[in-house]
């Protein structure tokens, strides 16, 4: 009888341990990029936080290709600015602009104007994604995406001031 009890106890122990294994792997929540209109608001606010005044957007010409680039927000008193690159923009511009940076890489800059002295930071929409409470858990919030965008704008403004860009 003792042997039977030990065997049954071991069986119960192993069965319960197997039941406590990791749960099913779940797919990541679907995400979407920050809307361009909202991104421009965030960019304008970030410029203000750096003590500068946001200026109206404008069209510029990329050096070497002659393709037009839309600067979504300029900085008053300076020629540099910020372009929020949507998937559609990236498709239209193709090889005229550098490929999207990964989150751990430096921001991409484009040279514009006749001599290429003017710098425009390219902020790719796909780098600012959120999950909008879809799925089981909220992993990437809108607030987080907006903070990352704001940080990138502020980093560029600091870089532009340090380098004394036009």
Please report, for each region that a protein language model flagged, where it lies by residue.
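Catalytic cores of nucleic-acid endonucleases
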Residues: 65-67, 86-144
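C-terminal motif of bacterial Sec signal peptides marking the signal peptidase cleavage site
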Residues: 16-19
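Active-site beta-strand-loop-beta-strand hairpin of nuclease catalytic cores
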Residues: 69-84
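Bacterial N-terminal signal peptides that target proteins for export
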Residues: 1-9
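Non-catalytic C-terminal interaction segments of nucleic acid-processing enzymes
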Residues: 27-31, 49, 76, 133-166
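N-terminal post-signal-peptidase region of extra-cytosolic proteins
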Residues: 54-70
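Acidic-basic catalytic patches of nuclease active cores, encompassing PD-(D/E)XK
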Residues: 21-59
């Amino acid at each position: 009888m003792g042997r039977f009890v030990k065997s049954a106890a071991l069986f119960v122990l192993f069965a319960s341990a197997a039941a406590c294994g990791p749960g099913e792997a779940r797919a990541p929540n679907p995400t979407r990029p920050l809307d361009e209109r909202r991104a421009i608001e965030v960019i304008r606010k970030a410029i203000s936080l750096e003590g500068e005044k946001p200026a109206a957007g404008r069209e510029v010409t990329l050096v070497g290709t002659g393709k037009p680039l839309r600067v979504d927000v300029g900085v008053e008193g300076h020629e540099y600015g910020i372009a929020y690159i949507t998937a559609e923009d990236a498709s239209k511009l193709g090889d005229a602009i550098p490929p999207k940076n990964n989150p751990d890489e430096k921001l991409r800059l484009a040279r514009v104007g006749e001599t290429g002295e003017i710098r425009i930071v390219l902020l790719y929409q796909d780098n600012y994604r959120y999950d909008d409470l879809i799925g089981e858990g909220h992993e990437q919030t809108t607030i987080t995406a907006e903070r990352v965008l704001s940080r990138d704008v502020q980093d560029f403004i600091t870089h532009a001031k340090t380098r004394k860009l036009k």
